[in-house]
Regions:
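P-loop (Walker A) phosphate-binding loop of NTP-binding proteins
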Residues: 11
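Walker A/P-loop
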Residues: 17
């Protein structure tokens, strides 16, 4: 694509990672892999570039930055110029909108999912990663509580959002991905 960078924002369990992966696979879009000081959760984990605190401190030209659970995450300007999509949280969006001075037009896509759908996805995901049912419930409820404050402006429709896409359990993933791609295509043709 090329003229825009699409910032993908959504609460935990909203499906933002799955949707982004589908946009990459089906339409050939490229996604930024954040630099992070977090350790990989499992061998072969993708979606991030895992580096030490010392390596992170040497990064320059950051255009997005956030911290979560004691770990730092960022993207640098060169990554934006070479990619189409970036999964990012609200703090990262705020940083990006102030720091990014490149040629691409930023567009914010908010993936909205109801609480029940998000909860069921998070519990299921935690259980498949080895947590007991009780641990999965507790970690999911903690994330939901954290998201309620972190994403408040997005949930209430008070944040600057260019496009909202609903992704609930009764929605077909393929239809959602196609709708988002249609939006992306229309933005790219507007910016040319």
């Amino acid at each position: 694509m090329g003229n825009c960078i699409f910032l993908i924002v959504g609460c935990s369990g909203s499906g933002k990672t799955t949707i982004t992966e589908q946009l990459e696979q089906k339409y050939g879009l490229k996604s930024i892999q954040s630099y992070t000081t977090r350790k990989p959760r499992y061998d072969g984990e993708t979606g991030h570039i895992f580096i030490s605190d010392e390596e992170f401190d040497k990064l320059t030209d950051m255009v997005a930055y956030t911290e979560f659970a004691g770990n730092r995450y960022c993207a640098i300007a060169e990554q934006v110029e070479n990619n189409d999509l970036y999964i990012i949280d609200p703090k990262g969006v705020d940083f990006f909108m102030k720091a990014y001075k490149g040629s691409k037009t930023p567009k914010i896509i908010f993936i909205s999912s109801n609480l029940t759908t998000r909860y069921e996805r998070m519990v299921g995901r935690a259980e498949t990663k080895g947590k007991s049912h009780q641990e999965a419930i507790e970690s999911s409820l903690t994330r939901i509580a954290n998201d309620a404050s972190e994403f408040y402006d997005y949930i209430q429709g008070q944040a600057w959002i260019d496009y909202v896409c609903k992704n609930n359990s009764n929605d077909k993933l393929e239809d959602i991905v196609d709708k988002i791609f249609d939006y992306i295509s229309s933005c790219e043709s507007e910016v040319r």
